[in-house]
């Protein structure tokens, strides 16, 4: 079971990530583009996924994953109940969101590792 600080540490471990606030919540950006937001009171993490990956995750576990309401959700923005995730699962989801958001050259460097 993850806590907010662990999620924060995982996000900040990715290259060139800066923490800001977004609607009074901790948010993480790469190249000034938002890729994750923590909703501490709800123990939720909002991440950007491809619509196909979002559909697959929700199909596998609709208790842990749900689409953000409206057009954002249709674009792949997904809510993950982080207290249901392992550290490895959370890391993979944050990395996936980061890869979709980071500049291609920077993303290519991470993919080489």
Task: Give, region by region, the residue ranges found by the protein language model.
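Charge-dense, helix-prone N-terminal extensions
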Residues: 1-113
